[in-house]
């Protein structure tokens, strides 16, 4: 009975979300001359969610979940910018990203309930999905961390020096905190990567089960919903760019080859870590389901 009430409440909240998201998307489309692509994805997600809720159609609900992920997959970039005192590129875009992430969680939960996958009688897994998971996250991030630290320490990589990277950050309006860290030989994204690696270990190691459930799950869900689609879509685009099917701007780099090299390092890190985080989050979610506080540990 409790499960049915919870599912009904989630569906109700999802319906309200669809209304708010749809209204925002329509408003942005009417008021802005060139609304972000995420706005159109959010509009499609709201429409699919509304139709899916009315018909209890899991295909439409999963489509809404996918479109919501597309709309919200860059939310993490907005969060990082705000954490380091920077302004987001677009307020409309940031709100769209946040609504997209919330919508992905809501529509995904309702879709799972419709398909019967959320079975309260299902037993929780007895052990972590694999102790290799956090090490996968570490390995995929190592080249990225090395590249960013090399620049922060004044080195040159892909034809760009650390001084040029710092100057580019200043031109892009980086915050004082961000620039100060770079001058000290630290890169803000490297610090976030280290926090992310710690989160991976927290999700699958026994000491992580002693924490309140929401504490690791909140950043884990945000990271999973943003990094997995962002990283995988980025890799897909790079494959097309590498084969010449699409073009790629060299940007601050001296050649397209340099741009591709740096992009491969970045998107491999994001996608590899995102997949590892997805597996760890899924296990932690199932292992701690029904526990609002720390989970007691059983000795073998």
Put a short name on every predicted segment:
Residues 26-41, 73-99, 148-187, 233-267:
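Membrane interfacial helix motifs at helix-loop boundaries and amphipathic/re-entrant anchors
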Residues 8-11, 57-60, 89-92, 96, ...:
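Membrane-interface helix-boundary signature
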Residues 1-12, 115-132, 291-300:
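Membrane-interfacial, low-structure loops and terminal tails that flank and connect transmembrane helices
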Residues 63-71, 136-152, 218-236:
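Hydrophobic alpha-helical membrane-insertion segments
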Residues 53-66, 199-224:
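Loop-to-transmembrane helix junctions at the membrane interface
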Residues 2-107, 111-115, 281-291:
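An N-terminus-focused feature that recognizes amino-terminal "leader" regions
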Residues 252-300:
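Extracellularly exposed regions in secreted/surface proteins, prominently low-complexity, repeat-rich
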Residues 51, 103-117, 138, 188-207, ...:
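Transmembrane alpha-helical segments in integral membrane proteins
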């Amino acid at each position: 009975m409790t499960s049915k009430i919870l599912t009904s409440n989630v569906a109700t909240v999802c319906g309200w979300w669809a209304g708010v998201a749809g209204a925002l998307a329509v408003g942005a489309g009417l008021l802005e001359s060139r609304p972000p692509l995420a706005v159109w994805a959010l509009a499609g997600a709201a429409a699919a969610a509304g139709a899916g809720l009315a018909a209890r159609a899991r295909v439409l609900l999963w489509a809404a979940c996918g479109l919501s992920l597309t709309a919200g997959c860059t939310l993490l970039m907005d969060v990082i910018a705000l954490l380091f005192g920077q302004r987001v590129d677009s307020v409309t875009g940031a709100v769209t990203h946040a609504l997209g992430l919330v919508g992905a969680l809501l529509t995904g939960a309702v879709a799972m309930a419709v398909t019967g996958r959320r079975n309260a009688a299902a037993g929780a897994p007895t052990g972590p999905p694999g102790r290799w998971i956090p090490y996968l996250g570490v390995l995929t991030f190592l080249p990225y961390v090395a590249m960013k630290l090399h620049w922060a320490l004044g080195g040159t990589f892909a034809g760009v020096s650390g001084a040029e990277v710092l100057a580019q950050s200043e031109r892009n309006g980086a915050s004082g905190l961000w620039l100060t860290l770079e001058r000290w030989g630290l890169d803000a994204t490297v610090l976030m990567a280290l926090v992310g690696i710690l989160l991976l270990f927290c999700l699958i190691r026994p000491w992580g089960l002693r924490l309140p459930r929401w504490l690791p799950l909140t950043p884990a869900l945000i990271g999973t919903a943003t990094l997995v689609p962002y990283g995988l879509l980025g890799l897909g685009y790079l494959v097309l760019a590498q084969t010449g099917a699409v073009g790629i701007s060299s940007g601050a780099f001296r050649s397209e080859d340099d741009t591709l090299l740096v992009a491969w390092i970045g998107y491999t890190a994001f996608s590899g870590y995102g997949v590892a985080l997805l597996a760890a989050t899924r296990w932690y979610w199932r292992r701690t389901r029904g526990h609002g506080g720390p989970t007691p540990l059983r000795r073998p």
